[in-house]
Design a protein with these regions (language model features):
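Extracellular zinc-dependent metalloprotease catalytic-domain scaffold
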Residues: 18-185, 191-292
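Cleavable N-terminal signal peptides of Sec/SRP-targeted secreted and luminal proteins
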Residues: 3-22
Length: 292
C-alpha cells in the first residue's frame, strides 16, 4: 500500500474519531471543601427506617436557563437526557427518604447557585437528591462535564450537587447523544457518592505499595464479593482506584487498567457498562439498595 493511500486512510480515520471522541471527566480536578448537612434544616417528618423506595432526583435548570448558552434544541435535548438518566437510576437504586428543608443561603455559599426555582425550599421533601445542571465556560476542549457534591447529610450521603457542562458540547455528532447520556450517568454517580470524600469517610480505602508506587483500592464487602466473581479470583483484596498521589487525592474513578469498559473510569470508552462491581459500591455505602 502506498504512503499516499495510507495517509488518506489515516485522515479519514482521524476525522471519524474526532466526531466520536470519548471525553474525559473533570471531577477529580475540582477542589472544594465538602459541607455536611448541619448547614441544612432537617424536617421532623421521616419514613419508616426500612422503607426503601426508588430514588427520586430533582433537577433545577433555573441557572442553566438563565446562563443562556444553549440553543432551544440543545437545551431541550440535554434536559431530556437528564430525565432519562434519572429514570435509569430509579430502576437501579432505592433509598430510605428523609425530609430536608433546603436553605437558599447554603445553595449560594456552598453550591455557587443563586438562581433557582420558586419551590426549591421543599425540593428535598418531594425528592431524595437535588442537582443543578450549569454551564462552565472554563473547561478544556476534552472535558465535556464534571460534577461535585456541595451538601452532604451527616452520614456522608450526598443531598445536593452540581453538574457542570461544557458549552461546546454538541448532540449532533456521531453517537454524541449516546456518549452524553453515559457521561451524565457517570457525573451523577459522583453526586450519588462515588467520590474520594465518601470513600475516605466510610473507611473504604485500602492501600499497598507495589514497585515503589502506592496503590489505593476500594475494599468494601460487596465490592470484593462482586470482584471475586468478575475476575474469577478468590485472593482479591479490593478494586484499584486511579492514583493521583496520596490518600487525600485517591481518585474518584476506577483504575482503567482493571476496569476498562466500566462507566466509572475517568475517560469515556466505546463500550460502556454499569458493572455489578460499581453497583456493589453503592450498596456498600448503606445509602441505597441496588437492583442488580
Amino acid at each position: 500500500m502506498s504512503k499516499k493511500i495510507m495517509m488518506v486512510i489515516l485522515i479519514i480515520f482521524t476525522k471519524f474519531f474526532s466526531s466520536t471522541i470519548c471525553f474525559k471527566c473533570g471531577t477529580d480536578l475540582i477542589k472544594r471543601e465538602p459541607v455536611l448537612m448541619n448547614n441544612l434544616k432537617p424536617n421532623n417528618k421521616r419514613r419508616l427506617a426500612n422503607e426503601y423506595t426508588p430514588i427520586k432526583i430533582k433537577y433545577d435548570y433555573s441557572q442553566l436557563i438563565e446562563q443562556d448558552y444553549l440553543s432551544g434544541n440543545d437545551l431541550n435535548d440535554l434536559i431530556n437526557l437528564f430525565s432519562e438518566v434519572g429514570e435509569s437510576f430509579r430502576s437501579l437504586l432505592s433509598i430510605v427518604h428523609e425530609d430536608i428543608l433546603v436553605d437558599t443561603d447554603d445553595l449560594k455559599n456552598h453550591c455557587e447557585i443563586d438562581t433557582y426555582s420558586s419551590d426549591i425550599y421543599n425540593s428535598l421533601i418531594t425528592h431524595d437528591l437535588l442537582i443543578f445542571p450549569v454551564i462552565n465556560t472554563e473547561m478544556d476542549e476534552y472535558t465535556m462535564a464534571q460534577s461535585w457534591v456541595c451538601l452532604y447529610a451527616n452520614n456522608f450521603r450526598p443531598t445536593v450537587g452540581v453538574v457542570e457542562i461544557n458549552p461546546n458540547f454538541s448532540l449532533y455528532q456521531i453517537d454524541a447523544a449516546y456518549s452524553m447520556k453515559y457521561l451524565l450517568l457517570h457525573e451523577i454517580s459522583h453526586i450519588l457518592g462515588f467520590t474520594g470524600f465518601v470513600f475516605r469517610n466510610l473507611n473504604f480505602i485500602y492501600s499497598e505499595t507495589i514497585n515503589g508506587e502506592e496503590i489505593f483500592y476500594i475494599n468494601s464487602t460487596k465490592v470484593i464479593e462482586k470482584a471475586k466473581i468478575h475476575f474469577n479470583c478468590e485472593n482479591i483484596k479490593g478494586v484499584a482506584l486511579e492514583n493521583l498521589g496520596g490518600v487525600e487525592s485517591a481518585g474518584s474513578h476506577w483504575e482503567a487498567r482493571y476496569m476498562l469498559g466500566d462507566y466509572m473510569i475517568s475517560t469515556d470508552y466505546s463500550e460502556i457498562v454499569i458493572s455489578d462491581i460499581t453497583l456493589a459500591y453503592f450498596e456498600d455505602t448503606g445509602f441505597y439498595k441496588v437492583n442488580y
